[in-house]
């Protein structure tokens, strides 16, 4: 298989974790006889410093010509005083919009060696493996009008929660398609007891469900879903929800694992082109120290192999390699206990690559 992958290192620790993930992908290409062509572009604060724009046209052209995009991180205090249009995060919003990346995927899988890092009890965490599918381009964050105005003689503000049938149908279809490759259960999260947009969402989810008789659909109000994620996260397989609810629930679910340094994510469109990135931020305080944890980015690359390229075996090989490394007690500083010796960004990547090579040798 031949694929072009756009690397967007971005800011802070981004260049370090992207460089290490590229090494893992090169090893996958060698072991499984693929050809990955890597191109690199600027985004975020790095792009602002170099070009004045958080998303230069050159980067957007590279994105449109690539099969998938791997992003490091954007942002940092250096650019906090910039105007909104000149903030690093604007580049990420712009590339999502330009590529029509409407589906955000946030897998939450609790790894046995790191159960102690979570604030939840181990019996609650055992076998947690869920996927949150969040609608990314509609809803309250994008609806118009959005404005300040005078209301009955005092300051007021208006935001608009707007969804169309097409926006709801396509994200719900995505959720059902992902569920078919998992445990075949979808929970649609809404606020249908209060919001008209949620009542439409629920009606359309029921209609879409009839096209997937092999998948079970249930509905849950968002306040109950927030509680159930903590009470019993094992009950969930695929959660699908609108933008605001998904933003909140995915951050809540991320803490089930106990470490942001292990959480990958993806933003995808209908054609399976995706932008893959770690959930964590740019961590400028440790940039250049060799202490960054690359595992979330490496696992994001595994998502890319599975969801954009259809390479399920290769994706699984990376996940198994990461699991093996953690089971061996190899840790970067962010996930190491006080009594454990932390290793560098490069060292933990080397361990992942060694685990990949061992798995490949054993399967011959």
Swiss-Prot record:
Q: Respond yes or no to whether keyword Ribosomal protein is given for this record.
A: no
Which cofactors does it use? Mg(2+); Mn(2+)
Q: Offer one example of a GO biological process linked to this entry.
A: L-leucine biosynthetic process
Localization annotation: Cytoplasm
Cite the binding residues for NAD(+).
Answer: 76-89, 281-293
| Binding locations of Mg(2+) | 223, 247, 251
Q: So what family is this one in? A: Belongs to the isocitrate and isopropylmalate dehydrogenases family. LeuB type 1 subfamily.
Question: What function does the entry list?
Answer: Catalyzes the oxidation of 3-carboxy-2-hydroxy-4-methylpentanoate (3-isopropylmalate) to 3-carboxy-4-methyl-2-oxopentanoate. The product decarboxylates to 4-methyl-2 oxopentanoate.
Q: What is this protein called?
A: 3-isopropylmalate dehydrogenase
Source organism (scientific name): Shouchella clausii (strain KSM-K16) (Alkalihalobacillus clausii)
């Amino acid at each position: 298989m031949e694929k072009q992958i756009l690397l967007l290192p971005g800011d802070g620790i981004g260049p370090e974790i992207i460089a290490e993930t590229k090494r893992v992908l090169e090893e996958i290409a060698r072991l499984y006889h693929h050809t990955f062509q890597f191109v690199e572009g600027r985004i975020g604060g790095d792009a602002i410093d170099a070009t004045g724009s958080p998303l230069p046209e050159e980067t957007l052209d590279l994105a449109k010509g690539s099969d998938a995009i791997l992003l490091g991180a954007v942002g940092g205090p250096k650019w906090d005083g910039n105007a909104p249009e000149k903030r690093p995060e604007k580049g990420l919003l712009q590339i999502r919009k330009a590529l029509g990346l409407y589906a955000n995927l946030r897998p939450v899988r609790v790894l046995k060696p790191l159960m102690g890092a979570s604030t939840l009890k181990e019996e609650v965490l055992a076998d947690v493996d869920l996927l949150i599918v969040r609608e990314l381009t509609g809803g309250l964050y994008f609806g118009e009008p959005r404005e300040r105005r005078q209301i009955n003689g005092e300051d007021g503000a208006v935001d608009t929660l707007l969804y169309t049938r097409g926006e709801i149908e396509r994200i719900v279809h995505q959720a059902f398609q992902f569920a078919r490759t998992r445990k075949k259960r979808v929970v649609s999260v809404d606020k249908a007891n209060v919001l008209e947009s949620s009542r439409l969402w629920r009606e359309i989810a029921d209609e879409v469900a009839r096209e997937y008789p092999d998948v079970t659909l249930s509905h849950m109000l968002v306040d109950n879903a927030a509680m159930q994620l903590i009470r019993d996260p094992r009950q969930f397989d695929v959660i699908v929800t609108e933008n605001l609810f998904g933003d909140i629930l995915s951050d809540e679910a991320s803490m089930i694992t106990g470490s942001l340094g292990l959480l990958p994510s993806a933003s995808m469109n209908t054609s399976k082109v995706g932008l893959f990135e770690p959930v964590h931020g740019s961590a400028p305080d440790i940039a250049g120290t060799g202490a960054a944890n690359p595992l979330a980015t490496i696992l994001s690359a595994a998502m890319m192999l599975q969801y954009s390229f259809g390479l399920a075996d290769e994706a699984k090989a990376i996940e198994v390699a990461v699991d093996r490394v953690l089971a061996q007690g190899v840790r970067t500083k962010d996930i190491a206990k006080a009594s454990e010796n932390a290793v560098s960004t490069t060292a933990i990547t080397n361990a992942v690559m060694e685990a990949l090579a061992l798995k490949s040798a054993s399967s011959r």
